[in-house]
Amino acid sequence: MKKFIIAEICVLLALAGGFWLGRVTGNNTSYEHYYDNADKAWTAVKQLDAPPVGLDSPDKSRLREVRAAYREVFENYPDSLWADDAIYQLASRISRTDEEAFALFRRLINNYPDSEWADDSMYAIAFASYQIAEELKKTGTLESLDAYYDRALALFNQLIATYPGSELSEQAQFNTAMCYYGKDELNNALAQFDILRVPFSDSPLLYQILYVTGEIYLKKQEYENARIEFTNVVDSGDPDLAPLASFGIPQSYLAEGKYQEALEGYQKVIDLYPDTKAGQDAYFYMGWAYERLEKYDEAIAQLEKGIELFPRNENAANAQVYIAQIALVNKDIAAAIDAFQKVADNATYDYDTRRMAQYWVGKIYEDNSETDLAVAAYQKLLVEFPEPHKEATHASNNVNENYIQTLRSTGL
């Protein structure tokens, strides 16, 4: 019996000894060098990322290697000094509107709330949400629009409350007002901007506040208040905002129906800021102000001047269409067709505008019983603009081979 007891004791001692030896010589070695290995991994990834590879880098293979290396740091060494840095650096190499980037930023905020990158991460998610909402608004997609603005609002407010000393706090306060503006909650936006005026009196954001306030008053049709705000920005001499604010003044007159004052204001923009986009736009808006005054010759001359000087301006296509429409109203058929054809043939203009113009060439010929020319114009529409107009009910979408065949037969 004793032999069995002694044997059992020996087995237990052997197991205990083996367990202890394993702790000393096994996995414990990796923990013993945990922080050294973390330092080495961080040094290696920084060397790999020198010079820093950006999201738009053409070397996608290197970008993938750098991303993988940063992930290895925070996945393998989550308690190291470098884990939060690695998460932030990886998230920064992914599109800010990508859900993977959101997940990484949230991970940093939740796991490392005291990190120097925590406020940046919160701001990144908030601003990306705001940008998504703005893009949805541009495309006319209203679904989820308020949800993105609301998410941005909540995160901007959380950043302000959680990190009051952050360098991003001021920008976050400004952006809360911009979220209200984006949601068309104009009174809330105005109230927020009014709150910021005094504390931001020495901030670089002050003139942005004044400019957007002017835009809000313009939307609210409070034209005199809009001009006051725009004038304050112009007087500041801000190189970026002063031209825009100067353009906003005649815009308010145009909206108010004071077309002569608008003309004078646009001319002032051209004189003061000829090399800015506002200066370019003023040429076109002068043409539209002349049209409102029923000075059609002056309107056409001004619009043609704008097109000649700035053929790639975003207003050029609409100006050319405007010229065609004025000619059509004046029953100058040849001029109208020529103007519409110029739009249709200009590859720098957007597809739908060109398709619409080509349709009108055919339509004018058809309405004037010039069947052969109408057929040729419509065939050109089908060949050069095979995709339908984005507006499902647009008249150009009704033109097809059957339409042309019917036109041929009825025109004989």
Predicted regions and their residues:
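Acidic, polar-rich low-complexity tracts and alpha-helical solenoid repeat scaffolds
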Residues: 1-412
